[in-house]
Amino acid sequence: MQQKNWNINLEEMMEAGIHFGHRTQKWNPKMSPYIFTERKGVHILNLTQTARFLSEACDLVFHAANEGKQFLIVGTKYQVSDLIASAAIKARCHYVNQKWLGGMLTNWSTMETRLQRFQDLENKANTGGFNRLPKREAAILKRQLSQLQKYLGGIKYMIDPPDIVIIADQHKESTAIKECINLGIPTICVVDTDCDPDLTDIPIPANDDARSSIRWILNKLTFAIHEGQSNYMLSKDS
């Protein structure tokens, strides 16, 4: 796989607080190769390792996007849910940022039924169909549509399970990771000092609590995806 320069700057990473891990009591020994030192009871991540894995992840998503592959970005912690949505929309990716519903990937046929229901209700709302119903029935359907928009709005155009899943928090998104493992879907996951790097295909050692850290990493990944998508569209047009 040809490597590109993704302009991964260590000073910028420090400014974003990517190097701050959890308190030393919370660590997972499997993260030892990615820890640089300990400072005042807090583990400090080795940003050289972070840069290495992030560059590898950017190469992967660039080449996948260059082949027209589809991506899903997952991050349901309230601190970063808006970042997940904005990054995914910018890179034309699918996303889940409110709650991972069990079976979202492993029970895809049921999810397809829900997405079809979502589309039907949305069409009915857009064409004034609710206005022709009794008030009580219309209110029930509007509530259903609101719930579907909240939880499935980021995947409403996803017609098949994704080719690659990007995950912002290993512990919070453990169900999503298990489903990806069961289906053999490659994952890229931010792993803090209390995580298990063996559970993901490309672990990115980084602070998974700070918005600035997640934003910086997402910006790099979505830029690489966008670059790959641009190449893909050019090749289709030629």
Curated annotation (Swiss-Prot):
NCBIfam families: rpsB_bact. GO terms for cellular component: chloroplast; mitochondrial small ribosomal subunit. One of its GO terms (molecular function) is structural constituent of ribosome. It is found in: Plastid, Chloroplast. InterPro entries: Ribosomal_uS2, Ribosomal_uS2_bac/mit/plastid, Ribosomal_uS2_CS, Ribosomal_uS2_flav_dom_sf. This is Small ribosomal subunit protein uS2c. GO terms for biological process: translation. The gene is rps2. Belongs to the universal ribosomal protein uS2 family. It comes from Angiopteris evecta (Mule's foot fern). It comes from the Eukaryota. The keyword Hydrolase does not apply. It holds the Pfam family Ribosomal_S2.
